[in-house]
Regions:
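Catalytic-site neighborhood detector that most strongly recognizes the C-terminal catalytic loop/helix
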Residues: 198-223
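Short, charged phosphate-coordinating catalytic segments
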Residues: 30-52
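C-terminal catalytic core of Y-nucleophile DNA break-rejoin enzymes
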Residues: 63-77, 83-86, 93-117, 127-150
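C-terminal secondary-structure termini that scaffold catalytic or DNA-interacting sites
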Residues: 2-5, 73-90, 224-232
């Protein structure tokens, strides 16, 4: 049967299927933190606070902005004329701008214990100016997650936007975290906290997990029969 997201029990099966501590830790952090794969792979040893039980996530995002070639005013994709200087814009100038954001996330004791064991075994790797927890490329991380899901006997997941089934990927573990959180509590306050935890700029992005989890439809359906419950 086609599924849209993973259950915590299925992710636990992936961890059990891991032969190496590194791979088990990768799956654990992707799910328990609900982070982007780039954030987990960019995790530094100094970002971990074992005493407070938190991890500081650095999110570096490069955004491409379009600008007028004459006055450098910002343009939208559909702009044919510059709103500032009025010239006809045949080819806008592309400018890459980096945005760096930080957020501090709580970590459960089991994940912290796994992290400590991994670091005690010398798992971290030193790079110029920093000590990374993982020495993995995005592609290699994707391969590890895919292979562990297959080894655990998990099905492919259906992507809602396309309706097509795909192998389990790191982002599906992030999705699983969000859906799990929404299924436990989908109140307004909980969704706001989830938005902050996930690093979503817009609450609309967070709200999509209510639809994926089925909670939104369940509430709607239950509301259709409220009168009958009172009559009974």
């Amino acid at each position: 049967m086609a599924k849209a997201y993973l259950e915590p029990e299925e992710i636990a099966q992936m961890e059990k299927a891991a032969e190496y501590l590194r791979d088990k830790l990768l799956v654990r952090l992707l799910f328990r933190l609900g982070c982007r794969v780039s954030e987990v792979l960019g995790l530094r040893v100094e970002d971990i606070d074992f005493r407070q039980g938190t991890i500081t996530i650095q999110h570096l995002k490069t955004r491409i902005q379009l600008a007028c070639p004459q006055c450098q005013a910002r343009l939208g994709k559909q702009h044919k004329f510059c709103p500032r200087c009025g010239i006809t814009v045949e080819q806008a100038v592309s400018q890459a701008r980096e945005q760096q954001r930080y957020r501090r996330l709580p970590v459960d004791k089991e994940a912290l214990g796994l992290l400590k064991e991994y670091l005690d075994r010398g798992g971290a790797v030193s790079k110029p100016g920093k000590k990374l927890v993982f020495n993995l490329s995005r592609h290699r991380a994707w391969q590890i997650v895919r292979d562990l899901a297959i080894k655990a006997g998990l099905p492919k997941l259906v992507i809602a936007e396309s309706g097509k089934a795909h192998n389990v990927s790191p982002h599906r573990l992030r999705d699983a975290f969000a859906v799990h959180a929404v299924k436990l509590n989908d109140s307004g306050d909980s969704l706001r906290l989830l938005q902050e935890h996930m690093g979503h700029k817009n609450i609309t992005t967070t709200m999509k997990y209510r639809k994926v989890s089925g909670e939104e439809q369940k509430e709607w359906y239950a509301s259709l029969w409220k009168g009958e419950e009172k009559d009974g």
